[in-house]
Every structure is written in C-alpha cells, then in structure tokens.
C-alpha cells in the first residue's frame, strides 16, 4: 500500500475523522468509517449517500450481517486485502452481494472456485444460482459426472439435490442413464417411491406420466431399465465417430461398410458451436481440444464418454490454440503446433494424461508449424509435413509454404528423420502392418494454388526410408484413415466425401459407398471407435 492508503487505513482502525457508523444488527456492534471510501467500493453506500434516501444524513447505517464479516469487508476497502477461508467465504459473498461490491465478489468467486469438490459442488451450484456467479456455476457443473458415476454419493442426496442434478445432467447424459440414477436413488430407501413422478417430470413432460401413480410409474420404469428392455443405442465396433458441426455440435456414428449412420448425441446449449478444434480418442472417451467457441479462441478441453454418453470438462490447455495436431502415445495426449490468437503458427507442445490435474509443456518444435500429421509409431510421436513460414521471394517476404520435415519425439527431444518425399500439409497418417502409411495431403504453393494429392507413401523405422506405394482414386487432404477388420480404409477429406479400401495383394484402392453428407453437420474433426 502507498503512504496515503496506509494513513487512511490507520484512520479507519482508530476511528479518526470518520463520518459514518456501520452497525451490525446481528451483534449490535459498530464500525466507524468514511463515507467517501465506502462510496468508492459499494454501489449500495454510494446510492444512499448521493440520493434522497432517509438514511442519507443519518450518522448510523444498520446492516443485517455478522460484525466480523462486515469488518473484514470494510477493511478491504481501505487495504485491498482480505483473508478468505472456507468458513467465511459464503458469508462474505452474501454481504458483498447486498452491498453491491463487485470487485470483492470477483475475488471471492475466484477463491471459492478453487475449493470445489464432489462433496460441496451441489451446494455451490445452488449457491451460484442464488448470487448469479456464472463461473462458479460452470465449475460446479464439472463435478456432476463424477457424482452420478458414484452411486454411494447419489443415494445419500436429498430430494432437492436430486432434482437439481436431474435438471443439469439430462443435458449431458441420455435418458436411460438419468432414469437409472433415479431408480438407484429410490431403491436405497423404500419411502422415496413417493417422489417418482416428481423426479421423472424433470426428464420430460410426457402426459402419460400424469395418469400413473408413483408406484405404477416406478414399476414401469424399473421393468424397462432393470430388465434391459430400454438401453443405450449400441455403438458397435468399427464405427467412425464424427464430431462437430456448423450450427449444431453433433456426435455422429457412421459405418462405411453398411452405410448406416445415426446421431449419438448433440450439444449446442452449454458448449456452443465449436470450430477449428482437434479430436483424439482414448479408452472409450473422445477428447475435444482447443479451437474456437462461438467465434472466440478457447483453451477448453471437453471429454465425451461414448459408452455412458457423459460430457465433462477436463483441465484446460495452457495456451489458446486452434488447428493444433493431436495424437495419443503411451497413454498421454499430445497437442502440438497449430495457430495462436493472432493467427500465427506456433511451436508449442503440450501433453496430458486423463488422471492429471493440468497439462504440461513439452519440448517445443524446432520452428512453428500447423496442419502436421501426427502418428504414434513404436510408442513414439512422429510429426510429418505441415505448413511453415519461409522467405521465398526476391523481396524477402515471409510466405506460408508446405513442409517436408519428419521428426520424432524421443526422451523429450525432437530427432530429425528422413524428409518426406514431397512437401505437404494435411497428410493422413496411420500405422498399418508395422509401417507408417501417409495418404494424400495438399501442396501449398505461394501465389499459385493449393493442389490436393492422391499419392501414398510408407515409412519403416528400421531403415529410416520412405517408399512410394500407390495412388488412391480420389485426390484428398485432411482425410481420415483407419483400419477395419485388418483392412485399411480412407474416408472423406477436405474436398471429398468418398471412401476407399486398400487391397494389399494388388496394391490398389477400391472406391466404396460415399459418406452421407449431413446438411446440419460440417465435420470439423473425426475419430475412430474401434
């Protein structure tokens, strides 16, 4: 604090030149203060002292609050400091809300967001609604999936907390799961059966519920759930999971062999439309990383459990990035390169495991790149091609060009390998029969054009050598490559919705049924569910 603030604080502590007394009604104790200081921080006091309120000229103002809480709040106005604890934080927020001290409310919200866990998140969710604390509300909701996956916690909730949870999770879990949670809660104590209709109406408002008694409705749902007549949509193996959309955030399953597709889930209310994000798949969970949300850059990482259809927030990236390249290696998710908030390419590398509380910085790339192809090969991360900036013309102007660099991450350092035969970005890479297969991609030539390609190269680490294999039927970039029943497929891409299968014996590609074009869904990213 500067000397002036120190002097004012000293006046406050000793009651010097004070012109107003704040009286705690709860304790009948008085705090002397200065109208000017109170008016600077509190809209409540400012309005009283600068309007025609009856209290304007009174020497005392009575506040229904605890004396100790009032004192540390008033002291904050003089010092800018306050000691917050788990025991006093909610009381401080309540009084600050009454006194309209926005600056301190923000500090309190930051503190309380750091003490959320499974034991208090429901209470704090209620608390956030009461005092319109949006960040606290979002943080509290992060823990709901952990609660509903823990039956011991669920069955101990009271009816009000159950209603709150159902209202929230019905947007992030399928109806089957919500019904099962309700049944498990009722079964724990027989007397809870009288709440069946009350709970079910928060899932949907179907009229037929009103004609049934609580017992009839309970038995009806129990029969469907426990006898397994109603269950999740089965997502069989060898489905492609396509994520994203221009207007609606869809999770869509598609099988190119049967040409069948269905929307597993959609989410646009809470998460908003996301673009330029990256997707990776690990242990039945899709991780949706970075990108833009409602047009703004985000560090957000979302997870979507395909089996139980639950959304969850994960620890954020350390940096705002979009169009980053991602892959899984040794149980860790890597996010490499991409673009920053200024649209410049970056060399940032971050990695994370689902059980970790934060992302960690890895060894940065040698130079900034984006649109690289990433692949896990022999438990090492390989980067192939991409875009980079380079001085290419007579005026020494930096241009964006395709790159032919190939590197692997070993012991947290990057090792340069044999260059890719052609400088490209948007290559699709996959490990198949102990080789890296690199398919298609595009060649960016400054001032000329962007050319999509259809050549296929394979790489072996044994001799660090690239070998031309064949050409696909359709030129494509940013396509999806995957293995179905030990056969290699390529699907879609930036400029096509075609599907091809590789014939290893003939070294040829056969075109199959095209991917359906979804009018409502522009596939920003894809992942394979195997």
From Swiss-Prot:
Q: Which PANTHER family match?
A: KELCH-LIKE PROTEIN 32, LD33804P
Sorted alphabetically, which Pfam families does this protein's record hold? BACK (PF07707), BTB (PF00651), Kelch_KLHDC2_KLHL20_DRC7 (PF24681)
Please give the name of this protein.
Protein C4
Protein's UniProt keywords contain Repeat: yes
Question: Does this entry carry the keyword Repeat?
Answer: yes
Entries under InterPro entries matching the protein: BACK, BTB/POZ_dom, Gal_Oxase/kelch_b-propeller, Kelch-typ_b-propeller, Kelch_1, SKP1/BTB/POZ_sf, Vaccinia_A55R
Which source organism?
Answer: Swinepox virus (strain Kasza) (SWPV)
* Entry-linked Gene3D superfamilies: 1.25.40.420, Kelch-type beta propeller, Potassium Channel Kv1.1, Chain A
Q: Which family does it belong to?
A: Belongs to the poxviruses Kelch family.
- Quote the SMART domains the UniProt record gives: BTB, Kelch
Q: Which residues form the BTB domain?
A: 18-86
Q: Where are the Kelch repeats?
A: 239-284, 285-331, 333-379, 381-434, 435-486, 487-529
For this UniProt record, the keywords arranged alphabetically read as follows: Kelch repeat, Repeat
PROSITE patterns, alphabetically? BTB (PS50097)
Which superkingdom does the taxonomy of this entry point to?
Viruses
